[in-house]
A protein has these predicted regions:
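Solvent-exposed interaction patches of small proteins and small membrane subunits
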Residues: 1-131
């Protein structure tokens, strides 16, 4: 995956990840901040699966959905807990298509406790591949 496109994609993911880090490290979010944190999660999600898509293409595999991208990452050893990533797909789809305050708070806790650490882990692994 040592292509300029893949490197740029990973840099974009890193910027979104830094923004998400600020959101998950802040206690007691207002409703607006909660919505912003979820939006940052959605950015990270989109940028990551697109980065994985580029990585797969560099190895000759065509990926067209986030589910395929995360399955590819699991097969490539970039992620361990495939269920976490499948849960992430469901939560991301829920936040994009509907907004409910109670669900938003639930998804935020998932982001903070499960998804953000998973993003950090895969970022490190992808960074190592590019060096």
């Amino acid at each position: 995956m040592k292509t300029k496109t893949a490197q740029q994609s990973l840099e974009n993911f890193k910027r979104a990840l830094d923004s998400l880090k600020n959101a998950v490290s802040k206690p007691n979010l207002s409703e607006l901040e909660l919505a912003g944190a979820i939006q940052n999660f959605e950015f990270c999600y989109e940028l990551l699966w697109k980065t994985l898509q580029k990585h797969a293409a560099a190895s000759g595999r065509r990926i067209v959905t986030p589910r395929e991208a995360f399955q590819f990452a699991h097969q490539a050893g970039l992620i361990q807990d495939e269920k976490l990533w499948l849960d992430m797909i469901e939560d991301r789809n829920e936040t994009v298509h509907t907004y409910d305050q109670t669900n938003a708070e639930h998804v935020y806790q998932e982001i903070k406790n499960r998804y953000f650490p998973a993003f950090l882990d895969i970022f490190k692994k992808l960074s190592d591949l590019l060096s």
